[in-house]
Regions:
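Sequence signature of WD/YWTD-type beta-propeller architectures
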Residues: 1-657
Length: 657
């Protein structure tokens, strides 16, 4: 088979709860206005006016929306009920940071694969709105993020890795500020080392953010004249710090004709990201969003040509109209014709043998929304099992419709932490949504951390990860009786981490993640295959040949087999990061994207592109799942979460410095 087929279920950290819309704030009247329509999430906008003070309004914006299942660029105009799709890169499932200037649309896309692993896919493109011709402005082999166009449109700035590979960082990216003429994108100048999210003031001043040596994210400034010849010897320049320590400042937007910049801030004693205006002349801040919406996060400001309006995106709120529920399951665009992609409002999906239901974990805190959830595969009805217990990772018995195996206890803890494998038997035929269950624990309480159960295709055995020896290795037990009556057999043994196993539908192999090639590094994992009898262990090489620096940088988890046993599905760090993580809410591992590959490592194909962490994938037990329109009115009786904008700021941004 040249390409895999089937339905993939997965989760995206935080994404279902964003509810982003684009807003503008009139600085004269302090009136806030929503510019987008409340469908899907809408973000990373820019005003689409002509670029001079006489056109200083907020009537048109270009922005990114995921309303078609992937990020694409749209134009919203006052008085029009629907936004207009703008040109996109053919085959691209990721567009970001659009700018409309002088008849050209600039945007980031990630549709062209680099020629090596751990090189980002993001690059800058432009589209002529008249002829719709798409041009790549980033040199092949280079990676660019976060473009900005100067006031006249003559110059472009980007945050760029150049041709350097991604170094594995995902808090502050090691990008430089690069400038080039719009008329000649091949002649690029590094004007400042170390920085991101550039913004122009005129044609000769660029502001950008950077994490300073004292630990505070701050705004920096460089001023220069672009060389008329090819003598770039005076570059890069030493930038001037603009914002003071004591407050985090990110994602600046220069206000034309002044020394002011709009910035997103995080302050001591404050839980929310807000937009403020910083006056570099008086060195003072003016808060603009906190007085209006003190308990909402606000992201990525942008400014109108005459500086009257400041825009941003935030959770739309519960009173503005638009989508107000979180779909249990929603479709996502797929790059492979034979694969259906479905995002789940939860983690660790596992489908029933007949394909009618999906088991998952909604939350990993028992008091919040723990236990095991079950939802119909069409996204409608939902049930809760073991409601007040912490559970994670599920495996539906392939031979019993009403039996699920799960892990009960805290997730991602030490080998000695008590976590147990449980067999849950239940009946969904009654009217109750909180379903009474028969829970049978299959592992002894004194055996430490037992988790990630996977059932054999005949339903007789479970393979799982256990820390009972002091290391996390794989074991096999009887699926009905566990280790109490059925005994237990150790499958792998060593001072490393073997985890997240998956049993082949052909019953001949078990796939798992392991750092056994480098046991001293708990951040790198590769895929391994082993037979159920313990023979035939081999590593699946994806990033490079055995012993290469690239292959030992792999962080690959949550591997599982396709329905025919010919393909592996997993989440990996092979493509770096797609957008600047500091511009988003919290993502634990923003490099996490979904891939498929054959069992020998060939045929590697990427499935997702965005600035989020995508993970815990699983193949649905049926080829295709029928869903209704995710943006239509919620059907009566559907059990879905209310959209409340419940997400966190990046946990690695601390004000305790």
């Amino acid at each position: 088979m040249d390409e895999p087929t089937g339905t993939v279920l997965f989760t995206t950290v935080g994404r279902p709860y964003y509810g982003f819309d684009v807003f503008s704030l009139d600085l004269a009247s302090r009136r806030e206005r929503r510019l987008t329509d409340g469908l899907s999430i809408n973000f990373n906008a820019q005003f689409a006016s002509a670029g001079d003070d006489e056109d200083d309004d907020d009537q048109k914006v270009v922005f990114v929306s995921e309303r078609t299942g992937c990020p694409r660029v749209y134009l919203a105009r006052s008085g029009f009920s629907q936004p207009e799709p703008l040109p996109s890169a053919p085959g691209s499932l990721f567009h970001d940071r659009p700018i409309l200037r002088n008849g050209l649309l600039y945007f980031i896309s990630a549709h062209e694969a680099p020629d090596k692993s751990f090189a980002g896919w993001s690059a800058l493109y432009s589209a002529d709105l008249e002829g719709r011709e798409i041009a790549r402005l980033t040199p092949y082999g280079s990676v660019d993020y976060s473009p900005a166009v100067s006031q006249t449109g003559k110059f472009v700035a980007v945050a760029s890795y150049g041709s350097r590979p991604w170094g594995g960082e995902f808090h502050a990216l090691n990008t430089d500020i690069v400038v080039f003429r719009e008329s000649d994108p091949t002649e690029r100048v590094v004007v400042a080392e170390g920085g991101g999210w550039p913004t122009w003031s005129g044609d000769s001043v660029v502001y950008f953010h950077r994490k300073a040596d004292d630990g505070w994210w701050s705004i920096f400034r460089v001023e220069f004249e672009f060389p008329q010849d090819t003598d770039f010897s005076r570059f890069p320049l030493a930038p001037t710090r603009v914002t003071p320590p004591g407050v985090h400042c990110f994602t600046p937007a220069a206000m034309p004709g002044s020394n002011k910049i709009a910035v997103a801030t995080r302050r001591r004693g404050k839980s929310y990201r807000h937009i403020e205006i910083f006056d570099a002349g008086s060195e003072s801040f003016v808060p603009i969003t906190e007085p209006l919406n003190p308990n909402f996060h606000h992201y990525n400001p942008f400014v109108s040509p005459g500086s009257r309006y400041v825009g941003y995106h935030r959770f739309r709120g519960e009173s503005t109209g638009g989508e107000s529920r979180v779909p249990n399951i929603e479709p996502v665009a797929s790059p492979i014709k034979g694969i259906q992609m479905l995002r789940l409002n939860g983690s660790f999906p596992s489908s029933s043998p007949d394909g009618q239901f999906v088991a998952f974990n909604h939350d990993f805190e028992a008091a919040v929304n723990g236990g095991v959830k079950i939802v119909r595969s069409d996204g409608s009805s939902r049930w809760t099992l073991i409601k007040d217990r912490t559970a994670f990772y599920n495996s539906w018995s392939p031979t019993e419709k009403n039996v699920i195996y799960t892990s009960i206890g805290p997730i991602f803890h030490s080998p000695k932490t008590t976590v147990q494998i449980a067999r849950i038997k239940f009946d969904l035929s009654g009217p109750e949504r909180d379903v009474a269950c028969d829970v049978k624990v299959l592992t002894r309480e004194d055996t430490g951390n037992n988790a990630f159960p996977a059932c054999s295709p005949d339903g007789k055995w479970l393979v799982f990860r256990s820390g009972r020896t002091g290391h996390k290795n794989l074991f096999i037990v009887d699926a009905a009786n566990g280790e109490f009556d059925g005994g237990i057999r150790q499958l792998t043994d060593g001072p490393w981490i073997d985890t997240m196993p998956s049993w082949s539908p052909n019953n001949d192999l078990i796939a798992f993640s392991s750092n056994r090639h480098n046991p001293g590094d708990a951040s790198t994992f590769s895929i391994y295959l082993i037979r159920p009898d313990g023979s035939g262990l081999r590593r699946v090489l994806l990033a490079g040949p055995e012993g290469s620096p690239e292959v030992d940088r792999e962080r690959i988890n949550h591997v599982c087999f396709s329905r025919d046993g010919e393909w592996l599905l997993f989440t990996a760090n092979l493509g770096g990061v797609t957008a600047e993580p500091v511009s988003w809410p919290n993502q634990f591992q923003p490099y996490g994207e979904l891939y498929v590959a054959r069992l020998d490592g060939s045929g590697l194909k990427r499935l997702t592109w965005n600035g989020f962490e995508n993970g815990t994938p699983a193949w649905h037990s049926t080829h295709a799942v029928g869903l209704g329109d995710p943006w239509s009115a919620t059907g009566e009786g559907w059990d879905e979460d209310k959209l409340r904008g419940q997400f966190e700021e990046p946990l690695w941004i601390s004000c305790n410095i």
